[in-house]
Amino acid sequence: MLMICGMYQLFGNAFITVEGERLPGIGILDVTTQGNAKRMIGPVVLRTAYGDVVGYENHSGSTQLAPGQQSFGMVRSGKGNNGSDGTEGAVTGNVFGSYLHGPLLPANPRFADALIKLAVERALGEPFRPAQIDDEIADQARTRQVRRLVRR
């Protein structure tokens, strides 16, 4: 399951509004989000288990991972979960939470393939061996984006 932005926050323990009201989440991801008046907006590059992942963030929530909660990736460029600890997103089992909008899956075929593999293997209970697909154009576009953003 891939949870983006508000769903990522909802899958956490709680969202604390700008006014200080604590709204409970469903607690699948061990994260807590504090709403802010200022938004974190812009392109992002992450280092992940699936290689470099590119996307676009646009969120006002500042998310803190609890000790032991695995992040989706480490920020190479951008703000990530909170603009300070270098993490982005959270992963528990087959649940991925992230602030990365934009063409996340088409721009990152290794990650997209991994999500499909998880879903198919869970549904069928057997290994998934997809046919080879030519991802060269997506790989070239992602590589250019990484080089452009990380050089700053």
Predicted regions and their residues:
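Short, acidic Gly/Pro/Ser/Thr-rich loop/turn segments
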Residues: T33-N36, S62-L65, P103-A107
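Catalytic beta-strand/loop cores that center a nucleophilic Ser/Cys/Thr
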Residues: V45-G93
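Hydrophobic/aromatic beta-strand patches that form the interior of the parallel beta-sheet core
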Residues: L2, G27, Y56, F96-S98
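Acyltransferase
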Residues: N94-R152
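Histidine-centered divalent metal-coordination motifs
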Residues: C5, H59, H101
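Short, flexible active-site loops
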Residues: R39-G42, G55, G97-L100
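Cysteine-nucleophile active-site neighborhood
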Residues: M1-Y50
